[in-house]
Every structure is written in structure tokens, then in C-alpha cells.
């Protein structure tokens, strides 16, 4: 039986998940419980667990949204260990794209299943090795984006509409609402992609996103993407009219026909592909703000054990 070490974001999902946390606290194999208290606190907590835990049955149980999951993953991977600590995940946030991609189900279903799992599944996570704006290595489970999608993340996180939609349990609607208002303020920018022996330079880019699974903000940006396949993809969208954008946006919620549009480019990235965003743009990693910068980084994949 696993021993669970819990990292819980009490603010996820507007904090309306007391019944879920009470059920988990009553589980006999919950060993320690940590509440996050400030941004990036989950990184610190996970790093500490990776440094100190010698429990062979330890599983880090994340209760929160995609952001808390991302912080935990990055904290655990900052420490070299003989064996990685598996991550279990109960989605209670407003951004639950990872849970959607893994078909995890509701929090109640996850709680019931946690005790029945006998070994973790190895899942691919994206890895970026940055040269600019910071020399750093970071990991993501969903996507890493620059331009429009990152601007939407930043605007949504600081918008009063996010709280309103979350209270109505329409978290994805906050992204959709912000997307339309952000469209008119997003400038185009040049991007260079060095992908194996192939080289691409696009001049009027509107959005550049590296994806590890189908969803962004609940929308299927790349329906065929699969967390269990050893592959990262990149979607690049060029600047377009608002009507054109609206047509594409509707397609995102259906069958992926947006990928056939002449303004949309899909690249299957080889390991070691290099991306260069030449102008200063906002960035996001699993829905968490990276700040603004001109980005230069290399992409690759790594597997990590998940208790799902």
C-alpha cells in the first residue's frame, strides 16, 4: 500500500473542496499533509520531499490544479534521486487539462482508485532547457506557450471574470472570455524553429505553443496528441483577422479542423529542437506565467512515474 505525502493548494477551485480534502485526510495511509501558502510554494515543498524521503512506498499526492501539479513536478525533478517519487493527482482546480488528457475522472473517482493502483504509469513530460530569458531547465505536463496563449493566461489570472466563472463552475469559460478581449492587443512576432535538419522562420506569428497533450484551457488545440507517446508537437498560428480567428476558435471545440487552416502550422518536434522567439513576448508553462522575454530554448522529453 502506498504512503501518501500530500501537497494541497487550499485556494484551488476557489477553495470549495472541503468534502474532498476531508475524505483524503481520513485515509489511513496519509502520512504528511502540506498546504501551499504562496506562489511556487509547491516547488519548495516537493523539493524538500525529494531531498528527505527514504520511504520506499512514498507517493506525492497533489490536490489542486494544473499549476500546483506543474510546481510539484518541477520541485521533485530539481533533486537527483536513485528513484523518482511517483505523483498522484486529484484535480480540484479551474485548469484541469492534465486530468482531461489522462481521463482521470472526478475527484471522488480518483480517491476510490488511489488505493487500488499497484504501480505507477510512466508518462512523458516536456522539458525545456532555456538560454533566454533565463538559463534554466523546466518541465511541463501540458504545454509551453508564447504569445497569444500566454497573454490569455496572464489576463485570465488577473481578471475579476475568472473568479466569477469559477463560482459558476465554468472555469474554461474564463479563458474563452479573455481570449476574445486579448485578441486585439496581441502583436505578431518572428519565430525560428530548428528541428533536426529542418529550419523554419515565420515572420508574423500570433501564437506558438509546444504541446504534450491535446488540451489548452479545455480546448482541443491538438486532438491527436498523447501523453503516453514519446513525442512533443508545436502549433504555430499566424496573425489573422478576428472573423478568421473566431472560425478557428469554434473549430477548436470540435474535430481539429483548425489544423488544416493555412495560418496554422503543426510541427512534430525532434528531440533537441531549438525554438527562438525574437521579440519580447509573454510566456506560460502549464497555465503558469513565465513573464515576458525573448525566448531561446531547446526541447526534449522525459518520462516520470504517475500514480494514476
Question: Model-predicted segments: where are they?
Answer:
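Short, well-ordered alpha-helical microsegments
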Residues: 42, 69-70, 217, 292
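Glycine-rich beta-alpha junction loops
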Residues: 10, 144-148, 211-214, 239
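ATP/nucleoside-binding phosphotransfer catalytic cores, i.e., glycine-rich phosphate-binding loops
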Residues: 195-197, 202, 221-222, 226-229, ...
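Catalytic core of DAGKc-family lipid kinases
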Residues: 79-88, 92-200, 204
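ATP/NTP phosphate-donor binding region
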Residues: 1-63, 70, 74, 79, ...
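Short glycine-/acidic-enriched loop or helix-start segments at secondary-structure transitions
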Residues: 16-17, 71-73, 99-101, 151, ...
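Glycine-rich phosphate/pyrophosphate-binding beta-alpha loops
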Residues: 149, 207-222, 289
